[in-house]
UniProtKB/Swiss-Prot annotation:
This is Riparin-5.1. Its main location: secreted. It comes from the Eukaryota. It comes from Crinia riparia (Streambank froglet). GO terms for biological process: defense response.
Length: 16
């Protein structure tokens, strides 16, 4: 799973 900052930079989304 790779976590990356969202467009707004508020939270980190997890994508795997």
């Amino acid at each position: 799973i790779v976590s990356y900052p969202d467009d707004a930079g508020e939270h980190a989304h997890k994508m795997g």
